Amino acid sequence: MANNMTDTMTKPDINNDSTSLQQNGNKAGQSWFERPIPGIKQQLTAQLTAVETEPSTKCSSCHSIITNTALIFNCYVCPHCDHHLPMSARERLNWLLDQVEGELGQEFTAKDPLKFVDSKPYPSRMAEAQEKTKESEALIVLYGKLRNLDIVTCAFDFRFMGGSMGSVVGDRFVQAAEKALADRVPLVCFAASGGARMQEGLLSLMQMARTAAAIERLRIAGVPYIVVLTNPVYGGVTASLAMLGDIHLAEPKAMIGFAGKRVIEQTVRETLEEPFQRAEFLLEHGVVDEVVHRHQMIDTIYRLLAKLCSVPNVDVQ
């Protein structure tokens, strides 16, 4: 009986089966555990195509590619390395204000009294900047509400000729200060500039004195003025309106100074190591009051203004 059972049962041929598996698995040159799940290639291709077609931005710090939708949702902060990317002036002000009630200074237009020409005429540079930014000048001024507070706020757009300060920027800032003074509401300025606009010569340098005088009138009247230093702030803007606030906030790692780092190194003949001229360096040396992450900036500004304006029941810690 045992012999019959042995005869009728067939022992598995291990060699033949393994050969068969190997042959089946290698139809596409892969072993069985390397074969892709059916349909996954099509899914990945569709996802990659969607990413490639959606407008994206490369982080200047970690070089990650971020979709513009994700970047806007995250307030232009890189989700991978927390680097603060630039924001346009209008985006920044609309982000700050809960309700925009109006805009100031649109009637001012730049003139070219010097007929200044460098590699191209000044009017041509202005036209290019206006086309690039869809703005008429480097400073935008809005007024409205930050929660329950009426405020006037302005922001530099670094994309517009490096956020340089010319006569129109000075006119708009002075008008913002006068509006804040007349309504007795706080003024908040987001600074991002390379300095005075060389194409306007002495007219641009004169704006340093004009803006400083306007800020002094606010100080005498007891109207709060807060400056937020973003990346970068240099030159005549640093030497005037950007350093005359009642409170100075700065975004992380923002470059802030008068002359550039390389200019200083050539003058003193020394190598200046990081974090020289960074916001954190200035905080350590008492130049700025606080370095604030962009995600906490609105809450911080509101708490400070609420304290300065004596708004009750606000935690200012």
UniProtKB/Swiss-Prot annotation:
C4-type zinc finger segments: 59-81
The keyword Metal-binding is assigned to this record: yes
Cofactor: how and how many bound: Binds 1 zinc ion per subunit.
Pathway recorded for this protein: Lipid metabolism; malonyl-CoA biosynthesis; malonyl-CoA from acetyl-CoA: step 1/1
Any one GO molecular-function label of the UniProt entry: zinc ion binding
Domain CoA carboxyltransferase N-terminal stretches: 55-317
Functional summary from the UniProt entry: Component of the acetyl coenzyme A carboxylase (ACC) complex. Biotin carboxylase (BC) catalyzes the carboxylation of biotin on its carrier protein (BCCP) and then the CO(2) group is transferred by the transcarboxylase to acetyl-CoA to form malonyl-CoA.
This protein's name: Acetyl-coenzyme A carboxylase carboxyl transferase subunit beta
Organism, as annotated: Psychrobacter cryohalolentis (strain ATCC BAA-1226 / DSM 17306 / VKM B-2378 / K5)
